């Protein structure tokens, strides 16, 4: 039960504290919105120029719907942006520790070297933010098995998120 709640609300300190006080998922909406707006407002800190901030804003709007999924950089989420622009935007968001692009490996021995020529899987920093921003909270809350929620993407997100905490990247 505790893991299911964690999977639903995430681990952002403000969200966890508010949930501990109120035990009400609906009361978390303004906190999630404040966090997301803060990320959107900080775009200029990450990117210079005209095009790059635009691509980052697009990712911060549409990218949540791609959590736990293998993505293509060119034309990401139905956009007209090319792979170079999207890749640069994702690299900046990775540096800001908002997300991680996880590349597959075919290695059978350690170290498992990522194959950066292949398509990555998108993992965001917090599953609670993903659930809120992708508007799948109700589906996740109602799921008997996390694998059934949102076509298994939340399971992909939470497992990848937890694995990333075992590295020095987070």
Put a short name on every predicted segment.
Residues 7, 12, 16-170:
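Accessory nucleic acid-recognition modules appended to NTPase machines
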